[in-house]
């Protein structure tokens, strides 16, 4: 006699495993975003340089990362580095590297846009006070830029959480991979397991991403007001 499909969620520690997999997904996303904010802020400042060479290099990096699918980058980092350079790198580390490269490009362009949108007198006032360029950015420019960027940075978290489903293809045991394992082990006894497992994963993604998306919208409205 076949079991009810919904029972697969409560067999053994299946539900706990799914939640632990979700934790891996969120962990990769948050760490990648934090690194992206740091490197992206630096890159955004560099992108405002008057040097044509620097602007060309940063723009090339930005367009290259945007054009290249994240899945291809994951394969290059995880399989390419391991085989060609004998580097032992885990799937989680590969994912963080790739998502940080992607996030840095996205964040860098946002920082560049935020800096160039600031009124020119902000820079002139700092220079008139005798501030060095480092002091000008540290005390005046970056605080304003970060405030403007916070909603976009939070929105980037949701995009990364959803994109992390790709890391299942390099063996990372995140929420989608856990779901596949549970489905495979119950394929014969519970044919409808895939519906309940993937349905649960969908609900979990929504439960995580929706509040983050609303927070981003709320902060953006407050900033505009």
Positions of the model-derived regions?
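Transmembrane alpha-helices and adjacent helix-loop boundaries
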Residues: 1-225
């Amino acid at each position: 006699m076949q079991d009810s499909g919904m029972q697969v969620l409560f067999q053994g520690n299946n539900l706990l495993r799914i939640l632990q997999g979700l934790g891996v997904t969120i962990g990769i996303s948050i760490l990648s975003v934090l690194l992206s904010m740091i490197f992206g802020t630096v890159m955004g400042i560099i992108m405002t340089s008057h040097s044509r060479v620097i602007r060309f290099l940063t723009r090339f990096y930005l367009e290259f990362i945007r054009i290249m699918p994240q899945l291809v980058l994951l394969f290059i980092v995880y399989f390419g580095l391991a085989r060609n350079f004998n580097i032992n790198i885990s799937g989680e580390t590969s994912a963080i590297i790739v998502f940080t490269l992607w996030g840095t490009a996205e964040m860098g362009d946002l920082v560049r846009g935020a800096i160039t949108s600031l009124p020119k007198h902000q820079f002139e006032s700092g220079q008139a006070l005798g501030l060095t360029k480092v002091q000008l950015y540290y005390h005046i420019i970056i605080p304003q830029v970060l405030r403007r960027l916070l909603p976009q940075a939070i929105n980037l978290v949701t995009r990364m959480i959803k994109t992390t489903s790709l890391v299942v293809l390099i063996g990372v045991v995140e929420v989608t991979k856990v779901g596949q394992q549970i489905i495979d082990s119950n394929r014969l006894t519970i044919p409808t397991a895939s519906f309940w497992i993937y349905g649960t994963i969908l609900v979990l993604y929504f439960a995580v991403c929706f509040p983050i998306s609303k927070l981003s919208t709320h902060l953006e409205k407050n900033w505009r007001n």
